[in-house]
Amino acid sequence: MVGFRAGDVPPTATVKFIGAGTAACIADLFTFPLDTAKVRLQIQGESKIPVNTGHGPVKYRGVFGTISTMVRVEGPRSLYSGLVAGLQRQMSFASVRIGLYDSVKQFYTKGSEHVGIGSRLMAGCTTGAMAVALAQPTDVVKVRFQAQNSAGANKRYHGTMDAYRTIAKEEGFRGLWKGTGPNITRNAIVNCTELVTYDLIKDALLKSSLMTDDLPCHFTSAFGAGFCTTVIASPVDVVKTRYMNSAPGQYCSALNCAVAMLTKEGPKAFYKGFMPSFLRLGSWNVVMFVTYEQLKRAMMAARHNWATPL
């Protein structure tokens, strides 16, 4: 378009909010099987209900071993168990934690052009906590579905709405917000690491003129952010998954869950599912951030075309 480049016009808060939720849903569609494999590996060793596969208590071995076992035993659809709740989660969760990040960052810097790492970290913590408070029930349902053996006769839930109703009925209103504490901790860490690392890598690449503000820069920044996030957030993520999936009374708190893991399974338990976590977060970050950047530009271009008379 002559005289107009979408990248030259800062996207509005609404564009960021809608774009973040949409991009996160697209990323989830591509990477959901890896997330399901991660959940299965993380809860392995704590389940009180043995799965009848004929191979003893250890069912899953590695990322692709987990995926192939699930497909063989439960069918291909099992890899997308909980997808509906996952998409509900991203539309409410990512829209807040990613879409509002720049606005909250500007609030902390009071509009200053210089943005220090402290302001970035505070913005990441704030939007991460806000997103969890809003979207926690969708995360609980998603994890329960992913952990559930689709081939078993005794399914805990038979649909997304059934899961919301059953949890509220059997565990009370608080059951839908189970694990909010560890999830806020996890997402404060994830948000700070993911968004701040993406911010810093992208700024460094642009300031050093190694790359321009385009797809290769977005890809590199997103991949680096995914790796850093996985390394830092994995222990909290494992505790969060175990605690949210636990039966009522199994753990009295998230801390009790962490202590039980350390006592029974050792320190390595906190990095169970690390490879699928990295594959998922790395690929999720790449798809989400690249899509998000392109969506922002496309939406700003469409907005300009709509506002400009022919």
Curated annotation (Swiss-Prot):
GO biological process, one term: transmembrane transport
Bilayer topology: Multi-pass membrane protein
All ranges on the Mitochondrial matrix side of the membrane: 33-78, 138-181, 236-269
Cellular component GO terms, alphabetical: mitochondrial inner membrane
Gene3D superfamilies noted in UniProt: Mitochondrial carrier domain (1.50.40.10)
Keywords attached to this entry: Membrane, Mitochondrion, Mitochondrion inner membrane, Repeat, Transmembrane, Transmembrane helix, Transport
Solcar-type repeats, residues: 11-107, 115-204, 213-298
Sequence similarity: Belongs to the mitochondrial carrier (TC 2.A.29) family.
PANTHER family in the record: MITOCHONDRIAL DICARBOXYLATE CARRIER-RELATED
Binding partners and assembly: Homotetramer. Adopts an asymmetrical dimer of dimers functional form.
Name of the protein this chain belongs to: Dicarboxylate carrier UCP2
UniProt organism field: Cyprinus carpio
Organism lineage: Eukaryota, Metazoa, Chordata, Craniata, Vertebrata
